[in-house]
Design a protein with these regions (language model features):
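Helix-to-loop junction immediately C-terminal to a conserved catalytic motif
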Residues: 54
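The feature captures the beta-strand-to-loop junction immediately N-terminal to the Walker
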Residues: 39-41
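ABC ATPase nucleotide-binding domains
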Residues: 84-86, 90, 94, 99-233
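Conserved ABC transporter NBD signature motif
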Residues: 62-73
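Conserved structural motif at the start of ABC-family nucleotide-binding domains
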Residues: 8, 23-25
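ABC ATPase nucleotide-binding domain helices that frame the ATP-binding cleft
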Residues: 47-50, 146
Length: 341
């Protein structure tokens, strides 16, 4: 998907609480109509980013622009209500004393409510039958829809979603995630989603920034992040790869699983995704199956070499492997990066 218009740019954002640095020189470009993901573990600074973009938190330094208009720097700080940015909080932040309709109407003027926009958003978010109910009578998924509808109702330039599906069970999270993405695409709404869920980030977002200790480690398409991580840290953030140590000479790196091409020289980390290892039963094979975990759609095979090192491969569920089986392997793809990156 190609995006041509830059809607938001943040440069050099920093934030500390006392001696604890939460964000260090954070930069971001958001394109109109895109869904941008910020992926990071708890405490990485991702929620702080959203709060600064929305205007609820003041950066220590840096600048934020929307359509080339400054909304924050050391001289200017546009208040949240004038930034035209909607926010969906992790806990939804619905008003318990207001029904669904009044919760959604909260950010609309009387004129906007009477224009039909309120009922349009209620219908768009499949909430018509619930509009007279109060939040405490709704399921988690329904409350999430109300929070999203309230954020979308004023037609903001973008919406920010803070861990939007964390509190839902896995099945409901998948269903609602698909609904939300479909709605964002349909309305051409620009969105930033922060999440710790790698599957969510990869499947939903057009661009993903991996955040670690307040720093963006890599920002790229989901495919680029997954297939070409620039460090072991990024590789681990979007999967569970086998990380091997090796030393490259003349473009070849030797590892415990074989010799591979490398664009780098010297000490390297070699990342091999489990799905990039094909295994076959072989009574004379150099590897031994240690464990098999069956997931239905596939299975993860843990195997060991004669040095006692353990590796993982993903395999189709049709072949049954037993502990102690001898196997041989074939590696289809690897990613290498300098060990000291």
């Amino acid at each position: 998907m190609v995006f041509n218009s830059l809607i938001l740019r943040a440069r050099g954002l920093k934030k500390s609480y006392g001696s604890e640095s939460v964000l260090a020189n954070f930069n971001i470009d958001i394109w109109k109509g895109s869904i941008f993901g910020i992926l990071g573990t708890s405490g990485s600074g991702k929620t702080t980013v959203l709060r600064m973009l929305a205007g609820f938190e003041t950066p220590d330094s840096g600048s934020i622009e929307m359509y080339d208009k400054v909304i924050y720097n050391q001289e200017i700080n546009i208040p949240p209500e004038n930034r035209n940015i909607g926010m969906v909080f992790q806990d939804y932040a619905l008003f318990p004393h207001l029904n669904v309709e009044k919760n959604i109407a909260f950010g609309l003027s009387k004129e906007e409510q009477n224009s039909g926009r309120l009922q349009e958003v209620i219908g768009m978010c499949n909430l018509t039958q619930y509009k007279n109910k109060f939040p405490q009578k709704l399921s988690g998924g329904q409350q999430q829809r109300v929070a999203l509808a309230r954020a979308l109702a004023p037609k903001p330039e973008m919406i920010l979603l803070d861990e939007p599906f964390t509190s839902l069970d896995a099945q409901m999270a998948r269903v609602l995630r698909d609904e939300v993405v479909s709605l964002l695409r349909e309305t051409k709404t620009t969105a930033i989603i922060v999440t710790h869920d790698q599957e969510e980030a990869l499947s939903v977002c057009d661009i993903v920034s991996v955040l670690e200790n307040g720093n963006v480690i890599q920002s790229a398409t989901p495919q680029e992040i997954y297939l070409n991580p620039i460090s072991q840290s990024v590789a681990n953030s979007v999967g569970d790869p086998n990380i091997l140590k090796g030393f490259s000479v003349d473009g070849r790196v030797e590892t415990s699983l074989g010799s591979f091409n490398s664009a780098y020289e010297g000490a390297l980390d070699v990342s091999i995704r489990p799905e990039c290892i094909e295994i076959n039963l072989d009574s004379m094979g150099p590897y031994t199956v240690k464990e098999c975990i069956f997931y239905g759609h596939d299975q993860v095979i843990s195997f060991q070499n004669n040095k006692g090192e353990i590796f993982r491969a993903r395999s189709l569920p049709s072949v049954i492997y037993e502990t102690g089986d001898k196997i041989c392997i074939e590696v289809s793809e690897v990613t290498t990066f300098p060990s000291n990156y």
